[in-house]
């Protein structure tokens, strides 16, 4: 059974179980972090795959095969094989077997890459990429300079988003689709993410309506309008995300790795 914890309360050091001298596994340029029980970060694997929301961990966890595998593995090991941590450094962390199965669900080629990397990590064969020659060292220095330049450019481009986050506490509610544009996300992507994470209702006549707990917390407002048609009356729902909700959701998206934190320039 998947459990959720608050990362700030339950993990004093996300890499507590890892020897500081040991190189963490890196796949496609993404560091695959672990929790102190040695479970692997599925969100990091998703980022390494380079694929969209349809291959996110939440989608895999909905499949019958994933549920059955988790149940059997937890019976066998007598431990929690998959957990979710909220807050800084959070995410969904899973037993190595589950992480490899998730990678296989993404693609067979990705499974092979992940499995070999985990084997190298477990057996201590994982080595940092140290330049072996002057040209390699120069190439590494150039790559680091390019990365620094790209980050600086992104900070300049994203500064309005950060300033927006500082203003929204007192702002009136906005439509979710408009908020997605402000964040630089696709409207459909944000709605899918909100449904996958249990914030919006996923099916039925109230699809895309916030669940009551999030309305009660003051994150959303809901307006119901009765519309008369030739086929009778129907209810239309208009959802707005409040200033409080905008700050809360931005933090959730940052914690999930959907948004990348940047610093505002003055």
UniProtKB/Swiss-Prot annotation:
InterPro entries: Ant_C, KilA/APSES_HTH, KilA_N. Residues 21-121 form the KilA-N domain. Disulfide bonds: none annotated. Coiled coil: none annotated. The keyword Glycosyltransferase does not apply. GO terms for molecular function: DNA binding. It comes from the Viruses. PROSITE patterns: KILA_N (PS51301). The keyword Aminoacyl-tRNA synthetase does not apply. Residues 176-195 bind DNA. Keywords: DNA-binding. Not essential for vegetative replication. Either interferes with plasmid establishment after transformation or is lethal to cells. May be related or lytic development of P1. This is Protein kilA. The lineage of its organism: Viruses, Duplodnaviria, Heunggongvirae, Uroviricota, Caudoviricetes.
């Amino acid at each position: 059974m998947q459990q959720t914890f608050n990362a700030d309360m339950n993990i004093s050091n996300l890499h507590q179980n890892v020897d500081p001298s040991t190189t963490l596994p890196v796949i496609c340029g993404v560091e695959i972090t672990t929790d102190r029980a040695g479970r692997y970060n599925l969100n990091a694997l998703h980022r390494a795959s380079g694929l969209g929301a349809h291959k996110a961990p939440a989608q895999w966890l909905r499949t019958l095969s994933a549920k059955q595998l988790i149940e059997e593995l937890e019976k066998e090991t007598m431990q929690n094989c998959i957990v979710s941590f909220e807050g800084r450094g959070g995410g969904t962390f899973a037993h190595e077997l589950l992480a490899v199965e998730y990678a296989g669900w993404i693609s067979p080629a990705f499974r092979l890459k992940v499995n070999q990397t985990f084997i190298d990590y477990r057996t201590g064969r994982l080595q940092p990429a140290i330049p072996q020659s002057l040209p390699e060292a120069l190439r590494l220095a150039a790559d680091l300079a390019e990365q620094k330049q790209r980050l600086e450019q992104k900070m300049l481009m994203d500064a309005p988003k950060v300033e927006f986050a500082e203003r929204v506490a007192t702002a009136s509610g906005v439509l979710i689709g408009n908020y997605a544009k402000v964040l630089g996300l696709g409207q459909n992507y944000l709605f899918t993410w909100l449904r996958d994470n249990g914030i919006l209702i996923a099916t039925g006549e109230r699809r895309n309506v916030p669940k009551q707990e999030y309305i009660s917390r003051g994150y959303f407002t809901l307006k119901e309008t009765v519309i008369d048609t030739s086929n009778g009356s129907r209810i239309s729902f208009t959802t707005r995300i409040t200033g409080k909700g905008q700050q809360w959701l931005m933090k959730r998206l940052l914690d999930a790795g959907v948004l990348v934190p940047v610093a505002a320039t003055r």
